Every structure is written in structure tokens, then in C-alpha cells.
């Protein structure tokens, strides 16, 4: 895996053009690993993402007694399913800062039973998990906090499930609902499971990914809009045999935005019209800003069509990819407003605060609300040292501030702690350098 120095100096780039093969989707990779582990049968996973977060999941599954093999040096894996019951009933599991690992694993371990501790880096212990724990403990699982209530670390012990209807708030993180949906088939041997959503559900496209993958592993979920989900009794996860992980649509956003800002065309391969990821709808925002976008079944291409137009839009459905729009707004013809992004506050860092702070370093005027950002672009983007807050998306987003270098020849940008991109895209800066035709150092 690529290792970067403590900082990376990026030079202004005049133009962006080229083709990028995307790494696998983080959301799909970690869901698929857990489903394959819980299934009956053996699953061949192709093009799994190589990253810190998938490594966390693989190591946790190994500690739980799940057998898996990597095929040579490829990103193809064989996972031998345990048919709903982990062989190891006592384990200490390190979760890093991987929300896509700790939340589904918490639910699966709580309903199957055992003696487990789950902990991570310091930021993980600041990310809320109380709504998920409350939903599970209400039906008889036994999950305790070993630190601050409502947050990891967690201690899971064997409980006694006495109910099969759960309720969870939908407005904090969609990963709580994902975790319950993935764990539900482990409880349906004799009785239906019903999951109710309290209030509005954010990030609905991520739930679509979950439902799609659960179905691929043989379980049907009946739904009443976004308010309730029923998993009928008698179902279990069954391996589909082979499954392919499509490219990461959130990672695609940086390259497509580069094409929209600095000429293009820039094409990403591995995700396209047939994607199950909601973040492909990022291109709708680029089109609103005036970019030209083309899509195939497994590729997307974007190019500039003049100066980007300012945008005022609701980004609740694509919170991760929306970060890219915040930086692209530096190049717009007026103030842009990103609305309904409150979930940014509980991600790898408080992304609203972090984004506002770093955009101001570049000369932007930024108004920060509880769930929105207003970005007024500067006349000229300033040189700056960008802090990344151990957040992979902050590092990748702000590489875009090096574009359109003709207008600000001589300005430079420094990315502090570039190694944080290893969470989802270890080779990101090499890929970005290829499409901007600039050396890294």
C-alpha cells in the first residue's frame, strides 16, 4: 500500500484530462464481506477495495473464526461463510475509524451472542452509536458502553431476545438502519422481523445499496416506503457464488469535478449507469453547474462547458460526494449553498466545520450553519496548507483547489497528512496526478 510523507505539495494544474480506473466501493466492499461471512456457502468476491477500512473488516472476521483467502496479489477474495453463527464467541475487535465495519458488526454480534469488545481510534469513540444500541437492547440484546454512553467502545454479551420488532431513528446515520437490516435475517429462523424508522431517513441511497446486496445473498425484504421493513421468517443468507464490487462512486466525484473545472474530458471506469450506488447522482449536481456529462453502463465522463454556475441544492441523498461540490464551488460564478448536510457533523470528522475552516484558508467566504454551508468563491484562490483531520475525503476534495492554475501562477497548496487517503483510495494522488499531468513533489 502506498505511503506518503507527512505532507504533499501540489502545484497548480492547467488542465485535467484522462481516464481513471476506480478502486472498489467502500460501502459495497464491507457490506459484501460481512454478508459473505454470514452466508451459507463460499463466495468469490472480485475487485474488493484495498483500504484501511476493508482491512479492519477482514481482520475482525478472521478473529471471529471466518476463513478467507486473497487470490495471489489481486483484489479477489474467497470467503467461507459460517451460516449465521461465528465460530469464535469471545474476541477483542479493533474497528479503526470504520463506521461501515463497527455498526453492522455490532448488530450481528449482538443478535448472535457471545462476549465481544469493539473499539477503535479516538475519533471512532466520538461517533454516535447510541440509536443502534438502543434499538438492539430494546429487543433483549446486551450491549454496554465501556466509555461515554452513546459512543464506542462497546462490550457485547449474550442476551435473550424477546421481541422481533425494532425501531430506530433515521436522521443521524443511515448505517444504523443498514446494521439492523443486515442482522435481521439472523433472527428470522422462526419469526418475522420488523424494523420501523422513526422520523425522516437520511442518505436513502445507502439503504438501497444494503437492500440490493441483501437480496443478492438470497433474502427478500418487504418495505413500506422508507418507514418500515419486514424480513419474513425462514430466510437465511445464501452465497450467490460470485459477486463483483463496482467502483467507488464517491471517489469518482473528484475526477469528474476536475473535468468540469479544468477542461476535461475526464472519464472514470468501474461505475456508470448501472450502478447500485446513489452517489452516481453527483453528476446531476455537476450538470446543474453547467458541466457536460456522458454515461455508459460502466463509465462516466465529465468536461468543462465554461465557468461553473453557482448551485443551491439539497444534498441529503449524497452526503459524501457533496463534499466535492463544496470545493468545486471555489470555481463558480457566485455563492453556492449546500443544504441538508447535517450528517457531515458525525462523519470521520465534523466535516461542516472542517470544510468551512479550510475553504476560508483558500480565500473563500464561508457561512456555516448547523446543516448547511454557503460558499462564496474568492477572486483568486490563495496558497494554503490544508489540514485533513484524519479524513480521507478532506484530503481528496482539496486536491481540486490546485486546478485552473493559469489564473494564479505560482500559488501552491500543501496537503497535510495525505496518508489518510488510505482509508478508501491509497493511490489517490498518483491517479489525480495522471489526469492533471503534474508531478507530486
UniProtKB/Swiss-Prot annotation:
CDD domains: EPSP_synthase (cd01556). Pathway: Metabolic intermediate biosynthesis; chorismate biosynthesis; chorismate from D-erythrose 4-phosphate and phosphoenolpyruvate: step 6/7. GO terms for molecular function: 3-phosphoshikimate 1-carboxyvinyltransferase activity. It comes from Janthinobacterium sp. (strain Marseille) (Minibacterium massiliensis). Belongs to the EPSP synthase family. Its EC number is 2.5.1.19. 3-phosphoshikimate binds at residues 26-27, 31, 173-175, 203, 320, 347. It catalyses: 3-phosphoshikimate + phosphoenolpyruvate = 5-O-(1-carboxyvinyl)-3-phosphoshikimate + phosphate. Monomer. GO terms for cellular component: cytoplasm. This is 3-phosphoshikimate 1-carboxyvinyltransferase. Pfam families: EPSP_synthase (PF00275). Catalyzes the transfer of the enolpyruvyl moiety of phosphoenolpyruvate (PEP) to the 5-hydroxyl of shikimate-3-phosphate (S3P) to produce enolpyruvyl shikimate-3-phosphate and inorganic phosphate. Its main location: cytoplasm. Gene3D superfamilies: Enolpyruvate transferase domain (3.65.10.10). GO terms for biological process: amino acid biosynthetic process; aromatic amino acid family biosynthetic process; chorismate biosynthetic process.
